[in-house]
Amino acid sequence: MRIVKGDKVKYLNLEGVAISNPYMYITDMETYIDVYFSEVREIMTVKINSLKKVN
C-alpha cells in the first residue's frame, strides 16, 4: 500500500511491529518523511519504510 501525503500511519519499531498509538499524519514525501506526531504535537522525520498505512 502506497503512503502519500495526508495519510494516517503508524510507526513500526525495529522488529517491524506497528506501535498502535499515536497515529501520525504524513506532511511531506521523500525517502525520509515528516510526520505529525499527534500525542506530542510535533513534527518528526522518519524513514518511509518505518511506517504502516492505517485504513
Predicted features along the sequence, with ranges:
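Basic/aromatic-rich interaction segments and small domains that mediate binding to polyanionic partners
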Residues: 2-55
